[in-house]
Amino acid sequence: MGKPVVAIVGRPNVGKSTIFNRIAGERISIVEDTPGVTRDRIYSSAEWLNHDFNLIDTGGIEVGDEPFLAQIRHQAEIAMEEADVIIFMTNGREGVTAADEEVAKILYRTKKPVVLAVNKVDNPEMRANIYDFYALGFGEPFPISGTHGLGLGDLLDAVSEHFKNIPETKYEDEVVQFCLIGRPNVGKSSLVNAMIGEERVIVSNIAGTTRDAIDTRFTYNQRDFVIVDTAGMRKKGKVYEATEKYSVLRALKAIDRSEVVCVVLDGEEGIIEQDKRIAGYAHEAGKAVVIVVNKWDAVEKDERTMKEFEEKVRDHFQFLDYAPVLFMSALTKKRIHTLMPAVMTASENHSMRVQTNILNDIIMDAVAMNPTPTHNGNRLKIYYATQVAVKPPTFVVFVNDPELMHFSYERFLENRIRDAFGFEGTPIRIFARARK
């Protein structure tokens, strides 16, 4: 078994995300005074008194026939199944409500340990109200204040009491982290679901359904992966709501946290300028990149369509000429099987080291094929090259004068290195340095 799992559940707007962020120690779950802001399961690692555990925030459970409410309830139920301990969050200002009683009925059926938290008890006078919560049937209620951070220690003490029989293990460093980025409604969530076969992320045809960066852990070919499914990035001019702003920042953070970035395009709508801007973030961050053309099932096509679309991709994304282009459909799952091998290859190449002697043979052969440039009568001299870093692979070429290294010749050397070693899916960087 892995680390203990703690799920926070409750009706909407009782402060689940605020408490989640308090315990996790960073702003992972988006917080607003609007019911329904958290709609998926949000994961984070946390620690209390030397106990490492995984924490899950969930959407507010509401009773109703609307499909979206049913989806959120289903997400919360999955979180409860995963959990070893459940924090049942209520609102001390509003007292016990009918909605709380409905959540309690669901919790009874789980037969999991439940710790009852009464949030928004912001001053001592409000403590008198918490006794009503005994009626929910989960023993002693713990008064807390997410706004002020009060009472969390007692709550976490009670939660960690249930960890005693759960062995702790930590995730290994070899875990590959990758994310899917793209503008809203290109099918990122659907791709995640198609890949891992579980309704991990709420899928809806409303653009912007996934508001938070949501980590999903899974194993593929005996290797561990973490996939970060990010909120769709909108054009800056359309980022009106504060929530949307947080989501864009979170998506950029997800790129920073990832080793491989899958840039998802809409095969039906084609390529727009925003797609290039989004892909540019990943390239500039030095991440490995895989280009995914989704919704290919919806495209009218003949034997030339795929080749023509790939040519458009290459034309629009000239800076990503190293990235493979995959065509697939999350809806029909056609060619979904090509995504993980491409991610694995990109990850391996992103971390690849080459032997210095072979590298220098390649460089010298390149110089013999295409002599170095001259400027004002001075010719560039290349003495030797070495690899100085990975993620991305980075090379330093020692020369007589770095100013003589024209970008076109640097590009030529990059192409020769790629011809020799591959490096599909990853940028490589070359820097000229004066030999001392």
Curated annotation (Swiss-Prot):
InterPro entries: G_ENGA (IPR031166), GTP-bd (IPR006073), GTPase_Der (IPR016484), KH_dom-like (IPR032859), KH_dom-like_a/b (IPR015946), P-loop_NTPase (IPR027417), Small_GTP-bd (IPR005225). One of its GO terms (molecular function) is ribosome binding. Keywords: GTP-binding, Nucleotide-binding, Repeat, Ribosome biogenesis. GTP 2 binds at residues 182-189, 229-233, 294-297. Residues 4-167, 176-351 form the EngA-type G domain. GO terms for biological process: ribosome biogenesis. Residues 352-436 form the KH-like domain. Pfam families: KH_dom-like, MMR_HSR1. It comes from the Bacteria. Gene3D superfamilies: 3.30.300.20, P-loop containing nucleotide triphosphate hydrolases. GTP 1 binds at residues 10-17, 57-61, 119-122. Associates with the 50S ribosomal subunit. GTPase that plays an essential role in the late steps of ribosome biogenesis. HAMAP family: GTPase_Der. Belongs to the TRAFAC class TrmE-Era-EngA-EngB-Septin-like GTPase superfamily. EngA (Der) GTPase family. This is GTPase Der. It comes from Bacillus licheniformis (strain ATCC 14580 / DSM 13 / JCM 2505 / CCUG 7422 / NBRC 12200 / NCIMB 9375 / NCTC 10341 / NRRL NRS-1264 / Gibson 46).
